[in-house]
Amino acid sequence: MSQARGFDRTITVFSPEGRLYQVEYAFKAFNNAGITSVGVTGKNCACVISQKKVPDKLIDASTVKHVFPITKGIGCVMTGSIADARAQVSRARSEAAEFEYKNGYPMPCDVLAKRMANIAQVSTQRAAMRPLGVAMTLVAVDDEIGPSLFKLDPAGFYIGYKATSAGPKQTETINWLEKRFKKDGIPSNLTDTVETGIQALMSSLSTDFKSTELQIGVVEDDKPFRVLSVEEIEAHLQSIAEKD
């Protein structure tokens, strides 16, 4: 840590090894939250899934949220600091609303991802600012490119995926998804897409979930983004159990 001394106090200065320590700390911050999320695209749909942990029995579970709508057709899952997550979601909604007001049509998912990544990158080079300790995974079904899935990180990097994960178990989850996609290809419908995501989390975390321990957002062709109810999640869990 002696090598980091002096260079981890500001995000605008590279260390002699070419590292930005505050940006690296931001990556650790969203992993330290202990929540793993996953995003999966299907042939005409996409979904995002997050663990849902309620640390205290007195907390109202309905107020613990990791999945958020951005616009009618775009949603996201936020992994990491929930305070930073709400700030980034609020900014994304503002950017999308301003884009639609100026251009007369909804902001495409890839354009929103690029805009939010550019905003995040600015936080890595200016003084008196810090990177957000959160990873943002956006989903939509675009009129031109179809199902879209983009992940943004605290460094301002973004890229599109067929399926991806964020959080402490993202490596294990992504490895499972790679094997699944290589074997079975892209899920053919919404049910398969959602259950693929759930099974990926189950495998990487080595646990069976209750319906109250997951939060799932889905978007389909010509249908708005929505968050599944506890009953709908339970139906998917029952379907997975019957297959096993």
UniProtKB/Swiss-Prot annotation:
Presence of the UniProt keyword RNA-binding in the record: no
Signal peptide stretch: none
Family matches, as SMART domains: Proteasome_A_N (SM00948)
PROSITE patterns linked: PROTEASOME_ALPHA_1 (PS00388), PROTEASOME_ALPHA_2 (PS51475)
Pfam family, one: Proteasome_A_N
Subcellular localization: Cytoplasm; Nucleus
Keyword field contains RNA-binding: no
GO cellular component: cytosol; nucleus; proteasome core complex, alpha-subunit complex
GO biological process, alphabetically ordered: proteasome-mediated ubiquitin-dependent protein catabolic process
InterPro entries reported for this sequence: Ntn_hydrolases_N, Proteasome_alpha, Proteasome_alpha-type, Proteasome_asu_N, Proteasome_sua/b, Proteasome_subunit_alpha6
UniProt keyword annotations, A-Z: Cytoplasm, Nucleus, Proteasome
PANTHER family: PROTEASOME SUBUNIT ALPHA/BETA (PTHR11599)
Function: The proteasome is a multicatalytic proteinase complex which is characterized by its ability to cleave peptides with Arg, Phe, Tyr, Leu, and Glu adjacent to the leaving group at neutral or slightly basic pH. The proteasome has an ATP-dependent proteolytic activity.
Record family assignment: Belongs to the peptidase T1A family.
Record's subunit section: The 26S proteasome consists of a 20S proteasome core and two 19S regulatory subunits. The 20S proteasome core is composed of 28 subunits that are arranged in four stacked rings, resulting in a barrel-shaped structure. The two end rings are each formed by seven alpha subunits, and the two central rings are each formed by seven beta subunits. The catalytic chamber with the active sites is on the inside of the barrel.
Protein name: Probable proteasome subunit alpha type-1
Organism of derivation: Schizosaccharomyces pombe (strain 972 / ATCC 24843)
